[in-house]
């Protein structure tokens, strides 16, 4: 997964830089969100793996599916999924047509297809969202601990992360008893493992090296 995130990083940055400079972050994020769902579909995966289908045809197919889903005035599965993630959405919007993919988005998709990187779109989407959060000076930190965090621990972790990242940090908590003690912190594709389990793994690696 880390390797895929690394491969996706330059594409996500290029997409976000363009979207940010041209004030179209929402349009690009909507496209990448739906495209991630399409690319994850088993039938689409088979199409991507078919050598008889050209890169141009694959790109056109993805854009066509997106346009069909969002420009319809009827409720469609992917449009409903998109609207359900937007807090400002009301029921009437599900029957409204949304904008089709722009020429710039189409060009981006064709570049991905030519470089055989369409399968990276889910990772591009996640990286794009990370860039957006950073641009807004807001970072999501996923903290997994062996036991539920106390309020004091939560505040301490958040304060240290905000001082380090120079940004507002939103803590997402999870509990994993197998960590034994301590915690892991994941931000984007970066993971800091300060758990006892992680330290034991490091020790084992050193002893067997």
Curated annotation (Swiss-Prot):
<keyword id="KW-0997">Cell inner membrane</keyword>
<keyword id="KW-0406">Ion transport</keyword>
<dbReference type="InterPro" id="IPR020781">
    <property type="entry name" value="ATPase_OSCP/d_CS"/>
</dbReference>
<comment type="function">
    <text>This protein is part of the stalk that links CF(0) to CF(1). It either transmits conformational changes from CF(0) to CF(1) or is implicated in proton conduction.</text>
</comment>
<comment type="function">
    <text>F(1)F(0) ATP synthase produces ATP from ADP in the presence of a proton or sodium gradient. F-type ATPases consist of two structural domains, F(1) containing the extramembraneous catalytic core and F(0) containing the membrane proton channel, linked together by a central stalk and a peripheral stalk. During catalysis, ATP synthesis in the catalytic domain of F(1) is coupled via a rotary mechanism of the central stalk subunits to proton translocation.</text>
</comment>
<protein>
    <recommendedName>
        <fullName>ATP synthase subunit delta</fullName>
    </recommendedName>
</protein>
<keyword id="KW-0139">CF(1)</keyword>
<dbReference type="GO" id="GO:0046933">
    <property type="term" value="F:proton-transporting ATP synthase activity, rotational mechanism"/>
</dbReference>
<comment type="subunit">
    <text>F-type ATPases have 2 components, F(1) - the catalytic core - and F(0) - the membrane proton channel. F(1) has five subunits: alpha(3), beta(3), gamma(1), delta(1), epsilon(1). F(0) has three main subunits: a(1), b(2) and c(10-14). The alpha and beta chains form an alternating ring which encloses part of the gamma chain. F(1) is attached to F(0) by a central stalk formed by the gamma and epsilon chains, while a peripheral stalk is formed by the delta and b chains.</text>
</comment>
<keyword id="KW-0066">ATP synthesis</keyword>
<keyword id="KW-1003">Cell membrane</keyword>
<comment type="similarity">
    <text>Belongs to the ATPase delta chain family.</text>
</comment>
<dbReference type="GO" id="GO:0005886">
    <property type="term" value="C:plasma membrane"/>
</dbReference>
<dbReference type="InterPro" id="IPR000711">
    <property type="entry name" value="ATPase_OSCP/dsu"/>
</dbReference>
<dbReference type="GO" id="GO:0045259">
    <property type="term" value="C:proton-transporting ATP synthase complex"/>
</dbReference>
<dbReference type="Pfam" id="PF00213">
    <property type="entry name" value="OSCP"/>
</dbReference>
<keyword id="KW-0472">Membrane</keyword>
<dbReference type="InterPro" id="IPR026015">
    <property type="entry name" value="ATP_synth_OSCP/delta_N_sf"/>
</dbReference>
<keyword id="KW-0375">Hydrogen ion transport</keyword>
<keyword id="KW-0813">Transport</keyword>
């Amino acid at each position: 997964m880390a390797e895929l995130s690394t491969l996706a990083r330059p594409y996500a940055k290029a997409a976000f830089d363009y979207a940010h400079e041209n004030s179209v972050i929402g349009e690009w994020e909507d496209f990448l969100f739906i495209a991630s769902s399409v690319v994850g579909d088993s039938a689409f995966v088979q199409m991507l793996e078919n050598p008889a289908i050209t890169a141009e045809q694959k790109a056109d197919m993805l854009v066509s599916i997106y346009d069909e889903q969002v420009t319809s005035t009827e409720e469609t599965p992917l449009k409903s999924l998109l609207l359900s993630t937007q807090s400002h959405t009301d029921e009437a919007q599900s029957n409204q047509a949304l904008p089709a993919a722009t020429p710039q988005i189409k060009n981006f998709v064709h570049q991905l297809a030519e470089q055989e990187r369409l399968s990276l779109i889910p990772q591009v989407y996640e990286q794009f969202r990370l860039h957006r959060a950073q641009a807004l000076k807001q970072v999501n930190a996923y903290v997994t601990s062996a036991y539920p965090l106390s309020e004091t621990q939560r505040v301490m972790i958040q304060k240290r992360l905000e001082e380090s990242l120079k940004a507002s940090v939103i803590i997402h908590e999870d509990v994993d008893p197998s960590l034994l003690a301590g915690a892991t912190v994941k931000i984007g594709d970066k993971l800091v493992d300060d758990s006892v389990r992680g330290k034991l793994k490091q020790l084992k690696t050193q002893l067997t090296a």
